[in-house]
Amino acid sequence: MGLDYYAVLQVTRNSEDAQIKKAYRKLALKNHPLKSSEPGAPEIFKQIAEAYDVLSDPVKRGIYDKFGEEGLKGGIPLEFGSQTPWTTGYVFHGNPDKVFHEFFGGDNPFSEFFDAEGNDIDLNFGGLWGRGVQKQDPPIERDLYLSLEDLFFGCTKKIKISRRVLNEDRYSSTIKDKILTIDVRPGWRQGTRITFEKEGDQGPNIIPADIIFIVKEKLHPRFRREHDNLFFVYPIPLGKALTCCTVEVKTLDDRLLNIPINDIVHPKYFKIVPGEGMPLPENPSKKGDLFIFFDIQFPTRLTPQKKQMLRQALLT
């Protein structure tokens, strides 16, 4: 279950921009790791930043309102026949400090944390200005939405992230962009984790967090994946279900399979086509199976003559 951005910011769906900004300011100041000693404050601070990053942008907010988190992060379909049939999915850069400093600009909302001589006070939260024992930030996990075609053939995804990089003085830092490249291998399953070690924010007293992308499968218009198998539902009229038929299935690699069905198709019947599923991650030259299920379509009405013919054929 993903984030409800409106719930995170404690606003309603019809809230105006000013209300969203006011909510972010209040919650960000309350939950900033320099202000809150609660164990969950860093994660809440990140969620607040991601929610504001989406809801403060009219385009992102519009997609989120209409298609939900899956549409926002997985991409939404464009017009039929487009060369790029899906929009690029949204990926939060994972840097709540960037959102915070862009929001407050040059103002220092934490002036109360500096002593009379202007020196920063050690709050021992391991944040950007903290001093003490060096520790690693918790991993930053982000969903990577991929189509079945991406996972069938394999592909390369390039994702831009923004992170803090230490300057030469090893104390101050600058936000810089970096491109992370993910080589998707054929057959990767949902839940596959890709780790980029220590690619998170740099700081004087922290080990940068690992960035972990977790594979999520986009919904497919024809197939549903179960492990390494593909499930396909074929609508079939009752007459063909009783008298045999040939099923045509267009595969992910654009081949057309003609599968003869010589059995009587009943509601629990299914056909297995070996080797027409997804590639096996450990051996992509081998594939799972294709399971064909049937949606038997009954007629909405029958003439008296047809009813009589069915009685003679089926009940005698």
UniProtKB/Swiss-Prot annotation:
InterPro entries attached to this UniProt entry: DnaJ_C, DnaJ_domain, DnaJ_domain_CS, DnaJ_subfamily_B, HSP40/DnaJ_pept-bd, J_dom_sf
Stored CDD domains: DnaJ, DnaJ_C
SMART domains given in the database record: DnaJ (SM00271)
Keywords: Cell projection, Chaperone, Cilium, Cilium biogenesis/degradation, Flagellum
Tissue specificity comment: Expressed in ciliated cell-containing tissues such as testis, brain, lung, ovary and oviduct.
Segments forming domain J: 4-68
A single cellular component GO annotation: 9+2 motile cilium
Tagged with keyword Kinase: no
Localization, UniProt: Cell projection, Cilium, Flagellum; Cell projection, Cilium
GO biological process: axonemal central apparatus assembly; epithelial cilium movement involved in extracellular fluid movement; flagellated sperm motility; mating; protein folding
Pfam families given in the database record: DnaJ, DnaJ_C
GO molecular function: unfolded protein binding
Stored Gene3D superfamilies: DnaJ domain, Urease metallochaperone UreE, N-terminal domain
Quaternary structure and interacting proteins, as annotated: Homodimer. Component of the axonemal radial spoke complex 1 (RS1), at least composed of spoke head proteins RSPH1, RSPH3, RSPH9 and the cilia-specific component RSPH4A or sperm-specific component RSPH6A, spoke stalk proteins RSPH14, DNAJB13, DYDC1, ROPN1L and NME5, and the anchor protein IQUB. Interacts with SUN5. Interacts with IQUB.
Annotated PANTHER family: DNAJ HOMOLOG SUBFAMILY B MEMBER 13, DNAJ HOMOLOG SUBFAMILY C MEMBER
Function: Functions as part of axonemal radial spoke complexes that play an important part in the motility of sperm and cilia.
Protein name, as recorded: DnaJ homolog subfamily B member 13
